[in-house]
């Protein structure tokens, strides 16, 4: 049995990369398969960097892939291991370990002192990460809310005006500023650029994803924001009308005043108006604002967990 780890070749390996990733992740019902068009949009984006992308071949046939990714816009001591993704029928033959070890070497060679890995919380994934020397540092919850009813009178700020903004350049710039001001104390924060924020809106349009942006205003000044929406590909995959609340932030001086509750209630109502029957959001258990408990009080329930693991490369 021979395992070869080779570099990803741009364009030539695109279809192969998508096929491996889609087949490897198909066991997760929340995963929406990627198309070649999706991958092309990803390649045009500000985060794409093929430097650390590798493909594994087992006895001459494609078996898996992984990405030793570095955020070029961040001044970080760590890089990221994305994957490894291995075809289901070829697992437990050393392919995933070979891909991971190659990624760790790649990041070390490129000057990184640590590496982060994130994965679905299940025994197989946890054991694999532990075998590579990783330790868990954060737990990320995916939480869902049935939209048969939207909570009201739960302490939301009555003085805040919740305004829906158009997806134009002014909104992109405002959202970018609010995101940076709201999340600067959070885990793995680094400043978001206007170009990155604009890219998210552009790709949503091109993929026919519905997005909406709500801003909370006090005395006409923006103090918080929420971005939500729905992806028709995800709806088709999961078999029901599910929408997401993708980002929620409140400026630090205005926290604990019910503004996040007001934004959440308006976001849930907006999803329901659009015909969604379920809402989903994500939260880090270590979130300094205590957001997990806020979501629980509003009726969100945890449906799955993702772990962030780390290890030194020195």
Regions picked out by a protein language model, each given a short descriptive name:
Residues 1, 61, 72, 88-160, ...:
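Acyl-donor-binding surface of acyltransferase catalytic domains
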Residues 1-41, 55, 62, 155-192:
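Short amphipathic alpha-helix that is part of the acyltransferase structural core
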Residues 21-22, 28-58, 62-70, 190-218, ...:
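Active-site rim helix/loop that mediates acceptor-substrate recognition in acyltransferases
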Residues 61-65, 79, 220-225, 243:
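Glycine-rich phosphate/pyrophosphate-binding loop shared by adenosine-nucleotide-utilizing enzymes
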Residues 76-88, 238-252:
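Conserved acetyl-CoA binding element of GNAT-fold acetyltransferases
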Residues 81, 115-119, 245, 279-283:
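Conserved hydrophobic beta-strand within the GNAT/NAT acetyltransferase core sheet
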Residues 86, 92-105, 250, 256-269, ...:
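Conserved acetyl-CoA-binding loop-helix of GNAT-fold acetyltransferases
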Residues 132-152, 265-269, 273-314:
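Active-site/acyl-donor-binding loops of N-acyltransferases
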